[in-house]
Amino acid sequence: MLRAGRYSKASSVLRAVGGKRPSVCMASRVLTRLYSNGKEDDQVASSSSPSSKPWYLQGTGKPEIDVTSPFVGKIKLPATPVPDTVVNVTEYMRDKLGVTDITCFNTHEAHRPCVKNGYVILGCVKSTRHGARSMIELMRFLKTEYGVLPQKEGGISVQELRKRQKRLQRKGNLTSASAELAGESDWYLIDSKLYDGNGSGVFVHLLTKEKREDLNLEGLYCTSEERGLYQKKVLSPSNDHLPNDDDDNVLAGLKRLALQNSRRYYSSTSSATADYARSSLQGGSNMENSDAPLFSLVDSLAQLPETEELDPQEWIRSLDAKWAFIDLTEKHWQARWLMYRLLYVNRLHALQRAQDGDSANLDHLKRDLTFCYKTLLEYFTLKQAMNGRLNKEELVGMLDIMLTQKELNGGYSKLVKHNRVLQQLLDHYKFHEPELFRDEQITIRTLKLMVSSQAKLNVLSEFVRFLRDTGYTNRNVAIKCIEILAEAKEWRELKTFMFRDTTAALLSDPMVWAHFLRSILAHGEPLLWRSLIDDGSILWLVRCGVDVRACEELHSALLELFQRAGYDAVKADSLLRDYIQDGACS
């Protein structure tokens, strides 16, 4: 129904045109003409022109973003060329998500090694809710644009955030609610799953401004040249917040006015002398050498006699009080490691002296030794957490200490504990020093930790097979495997390792044969000795062309084997007799 005013107007127009009551068709045509916008006359032209769509359906072109504008956030990329994916992700974060202060680092150029190499992008979000929304949108962009399934760490989803807010608001303690939620969603880490040809990934950190300043992730991923730019500056305490004594004095204004109008023609400070300048310079040098007390403490401990009774906990507390938590060098870590070892050796010798003297009270000495041992293990975690670089010497020294602990108590349960500690210790080097797993010293000490005079680990044979399959067995490692298998009386594994798993070069080595025979004679039985001769295992010397006469140790061990087995080497098989006596087959 049309309104009365409009309908009366249309009726008057129709009467003027026709002079009679209008029909329905004529009324509809007049109403269409009256209320149309005047563009239906040229229907062909209007359908082809872009203005035929209403203004609210016409698409407006997206304006180009002026990156030179000071109001547009800058993106800081590494000096080296970066993949297009990094550029696209950073631009999307800036243009679509509103992330500011975007910085990208290439971890291959970082001053410290990283667990996962690639490109790390840092960006600031305005709030925790902005960070949650940006995380969701960025993961959706990566999924639709590149077809990957990114992963995120940190924070909670928006739905979970709302649930927790409602749950905490029902408790009525809004202060604790806001504090709890703020710590869970102010930092997001997104693994984009985008990799280049070298296997380098892209990792995005979305942080609030306060969280970013607190973590200072730039100091971890920057290069050595940029390290000074991102180093945290320790602000000196200011006295501006302290109250002024004159604030409560009603005559303070008159006093300041009098001081402004007065002139002083004298100085209350003493004149500078040569002694004063010398003392000032000495004070400045002492400030620069602020680590001197730390090294003096370690030197004083090293100069103490071996029989001195020490309290390890007190010494370590003194060390922590003088420890510098910034600008740490390898010299600082060497001092800490030396102090830990000195304390351990002191307590170890004290325990040994007490055991030799048949002392009844050994509990406090064992507690001190256990404390020093655990402190040495915690050293590796502490150094890695404070961006220190672990080295081979520290690992070898720690393995020697673990061998000493094994000698004190070498039961099966203790071997299992040492093996578990060894796994945790090697995990620190898994990503930073993987070549150490091929090192001869590390491998030999690892083998020693698997067996004792009282027990052996079930994993010993598997570890020996692992060394065989990976090709880590050189002469020294093969000799140590033979000695340990013989000590554990694993005769079947020993024969398999010697005659089937050992390479031809090692089987032709006279020193390997000499240690093999000596280990058999030291830990074997007459039945085993006879079986080596009867089953023809000794004939491998002839097959491999080993010169028995050239190695006196091998020759004497072979003669002793025949003698202890009840055989006469001179009356043995002619082939073997000539080989033993002359060093060659006739």
UniProtKB/Swiss-Prot annotation:
Q: How does it sit in the membrane?
A: Peripheral membrane protein
Among Gene3D superfamilies, the record links this protein to: Beta Polymerase, domain 2 (3.30.460.10)
GO CC annotation: what is one?
mitochondrial inner membrane
State the organism named in the record: Eremothecium gossypii (strain ATCC 10895 / CBS 109.51 / FGSC 9923 / NRRL Y-1056)
Q: Where in the cell is it found?
A: Mitochondrion inner membrane
Transit peptide limits: 1-35
Primary residence: mitochondrion
Keyword field: Membrane, Mitochondrion, Mitochondrion inner membrane, Transit peptide
**Which residue ranges does the record annotate as region Disordered?**
39-59
| Described function | Probable mitochondrial mRNA stabilization factor.
**Any single biological process term in GO:** mitochondrial gene expression
What protein family does this chain belong to?
Belongs to the ATP25 family.
Q: Does the keyword Glycoprotein apply?
A: no
- This protein is called ATPase synthesis protein 25, mitochondrial
